[in-house]
A protein has these predicted regions:
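N-terminal Sec signal peptide and the immediately downstream disordered periplasmic leader
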Residues: 1-53, 61-63, 183-184, 225-229
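N-terminal periplasmic accessory domains that precede
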Residues: 58-61, 77-80, 91-94, 111-115, ...
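Extracytoplasmic beta-strand/coil segments of soluble accessory domains associated
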Residues: 59-100, 123
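Short acidic/polar hinge/loop motifs at secondary-structure boundaries
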Residues: 97-129, 221
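Gram-negative outer-membrane beta-barrel transporters
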Residues: 161, 324, 376-380, 487-490, ...
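Membrane-embedded beta-barrel scaffold of Gram-negative outer-membrane proteins
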Residues: 162, 282-298, 408, 416, ...
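Face-selective signature of the C-terminal outer-membrane beta-barrel domain
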Residues: 224-242, 262-397, 406-410, 483-484, ...
């Protein structure tokens, strides 16, 4: 290899190493900080890392991250952070929330993580583990995932990527994806544009309860206007279309009542934002509107076509955010952030339990004020304190304080820890007066002795809340980085729904329609979640890096019908080991990873019969087996702007089937991508 090429290769590796040690994040405090100094437990995944792997949605991006579990049944895999389900994690794109789960009833998991940009448009993903409600309000109870996109380029640039996955076993569906990203100036130094989009198609699995077929399309455009050095304006609009197909004889069992079906899950959004610099103070303002709808279609043998079903839930969210960030000196250096938020959610849907067939409109409005200050008392110690006051039109006021300290004990050792609070507002269907939510599954029966039920909304429900304590340390000598965190979360007032029974244990019928069993929402469950997160990075040589992480999560419900069981089906143990190697061949990199997903325990009134039975305090739950998978891959810079990536996932073809795991894991599969950059 020529000397010049070797020198360039060394520079690139040194740059990547420096970037790893000095990553800048914004999610933990609302302004830019070094990741080690951030007042939270935070992981960063770079856009470059995403482009080396098969990346279709956030679950692909986060499967290696410490403290994060991707779990669930085949079509509802969701992101769990520190033992809390996906609905307790706030997903942001450039700091703007995505909250369209209410548009998808009776199974809303597995979709929200798809409404994100392609890998080429992403600069990094920041994952904050633990409550962040003092800054972000409701839904940030388990943590925050913030997808940060790339800045508008000074010169026109872009890329097109095509990738595909071929399954070794024909019972799994193959997949193909095409994505693009482009950015550049319209008026030099004044007006710029970004456009990105993608199309994805995955075949339906050919076995019962497998992964449904999918077709996904999205397109987003953004204008950036900078009239002078003190002001930036951004205008963005985007659309996404997700379709899921399930056919009789493939993922739906054969039977006299079985019908093939598909659903469309649409999301449109637009946003306007402004950043202003007013001397030492910086202001950030944004307004976001998002609209989402689900439509279901069933195949009619009589008509020979798919017929749209009458129910089509639609949600429209409006979010207005504003904040000011001001540095000042008073007994040390301060960075004070103050701001507020207005959030209105409007749901248009049938009231299914009342069987009127008419759409009704339900709404909920929240507003908030918050303040947070980072006080650097000394060069080696910073204390962050924050307080947020939220007001919800139904349940009233809620305070979310936090305090967090970061101490640079030595040049290599940083100790950090604090107390954070979180809360989650009840969803609209749980508190809308008069709403009756049907339950019981597609095979339930409606009648005087039927098994179908209705869950009655209760406007008096309280917000779920948590208090989390954590202490951790990071040791970094340049070649080796070690990190460890212990966390403890006290979870209160979990909202659950249970059937109402009489003294003899028989189901109570709903007085307004005795053909339904009666269910109610309750604030009854308290739980404790605790765990340990360990991580290590070793730059063994200039060409070889090892990364490892381990997460232990233990949770137990303290009250309710399932006391003693975990709060959610999260693996007790997770571990990951990854190696990255710059080979002696110019432009060629290789990687390998091992992922361990430990045993899970699930319990609840609707628990399926998969897995092994387990009894705690006289109640029956299910245990799901652990499994380990191995992946290998490579990246090759062909030259002339072309990059080739390839990987073998689940190298040893580990079977993860519904019967034992209550989940479906694809077998050995082969992935390849080709990116053209211009």
């Amino acid at each position: 290899m020529p000397v010049e090429a070797l020198a360039q290769k060394a520079k690139e590796k040194d740059k990547e190493k420096a970037t790893e040690l000095e990553q800048i994040v914004v999610t933990a405090a609302g302004f830019e900080q070094n990741v080690k100094e951030a007042p939270a437990s935070i992981t960063v995944i770079t856009g470059e890392d995403l482009q080396k792997r098969s990346f279709r949605d956030l679950t692909d991006a986060l499967r290696d991250a410490q403290g994060v579990a991707v779990t669930g049944v085949a079509n509802e895999r969701d992101i769990f952070i520190r033992g809390l389900p996906g609905s307790y994690t706030l997903i942001l794109v450039d700091g703007k929330r995505q909250s369209t789960r209410d548009a998808r009833t009776n199974g809303n998991s597995g979709f929200e993580q798809s409404f994100i940009p392609p890998a080429a448009a992403i600069e990094r993903i920041e994952i904050v583990r633990g409550p962040m409600s003092s800054l972000y309000g409701s839904d940030a109870m388990g943590g925050v995932i913030n997808v940060i996109t790339r800045k508008v380029a000074d010169t026109w640039t872009g890329s097109v990527t095509t990738d595909g996955t071929v399954q070794q076993h024909k019972r799994f569906g193959n997949a193909g994806q095409l994505s693009f990203y482009t950015s550049g100036p319209i008026l030099e130094d004044t007006l710029g544009m970004q456009i990105w989009g993608r199309g994805l198609k995955r075949g339906e699995d050919k076995f019962l309860s497998g992964i449904t077929g999918s077709r996904e399309h999205d397109l987003t455009a953004r204008l950036a206007y900078t009239p002078n050095e003190d002001h930036d304006f951004f205008l963005e609009g985007g659309t996404a279309r997700l379709r899921r197909d399930a056919n009789v004889g493939n993922t739906i069992a054969l039977g006299p009542r079985a019908v093939s079906t598909y659903n469309d899950n649409d999301r449109d959004h637009w946003s306007f934002s402004h950043t202003g610099r007013w001397g030492p103070t910086t202001s950030d303002f944004s307004m976001l509107q998002e609209w989402a709808e689900r439509r279901n279609y069933n195949y009619s043998q009589a008509d020979g076509r798919f017929i749209k079903q009458p129910r089509a839930p639609e949600v429209r969210n409006t979010v207005i955010d504003g904040k000011f960030t001001t540095p000042f000196e008073l007994g040390g250096s301060h960075t004070l952030m103050t701001g507020g938020q207005y959030f209105e959610a409007r749901l248009s849907d049938q009231n299914p339990g009342r069987r009127t067939g008419r759409n009704e409109t339900f709404s909920a409005t929240q507003s908030a004020l918050f303040a947070e200050d980072e006080w650097r008392m000394a060069d080696s110690f910073a204390l962050t304190t924050g307080l947020r006051l939220d007001h919800h039109e139904e349940y009233g006021y809620h305070l979310s304080p936090r305090i967090y300290g970061v101490w640079d004990a030595t040049d290599m050792l940083t100790v950090k820890g604090g107390i954070s609070t979180g809360f989650r507002a009840p969803d609209i269907r749980s508190i809308a007066p008069g709403y009756a939510y049907t339950t019981g599954g597609g095979s339930c029966t409606y009648g005087p002795t039927g098994t179908c039920g209705v869950i009655i909304a209760d406007p008096s429900l309280k917000a779920e809340s948590s208090t989390s304590y954590e202490i951790g340390a990071i040791w970094d000598n340049g070649d080796v980085i070690l990190g460890g965190t212990y966390f403890y979360t006290d979870f209160k007032d979990k909202i659950t729904n249970m059937p109402v029974v009489d003294a003899a244990g028989n189901p109570v019928r709903w007085s307004e329609d005795p053909n339904y069993r009666l269910w109610y929402n309750y604030n009854i469950d308290d739980a404790v979640i605790q765990g340990v997160e360990l991580t290590a990075t070793w730059n063994a040589t200039a060409d070889l890096t090892f990364r490892a992480s381990y997460t232990y999560t233990q949770s137990a419900q303290k009250t309710g019908d399932f006391a003693g069981f975990p709060l959610a089906r999260t693996p007790e143990h997770m571990a990951n080991l990854r190696a990255d190697w710059y080979t002696p061949v110019e432009g060629l990199e290789a990687w390998a990873s091992v992922n361990y997903h430990g045993e899970e325990i699930g319990a609840g009134p609707r628990i399926p019969t998969n897995g092994k039975p387990v009894t705690i305090n006289g109640k029956l739950g299910r245990k799901y087996d652990a499994y380990t998978t191995v992946d290998i891959g490579t990246k090759y810079d062909v030259g002339e702007g072309l990059t080739l990536n390839a990987a073998v996932y689940n190298l040893f073809d580990k079977e993860v089937e519904q019967t034992d795991f209550n989940a479906v894991g694809e077998g050995r599969r082969f992935w390849m991508s080709l990116t053209a950059t211009f």
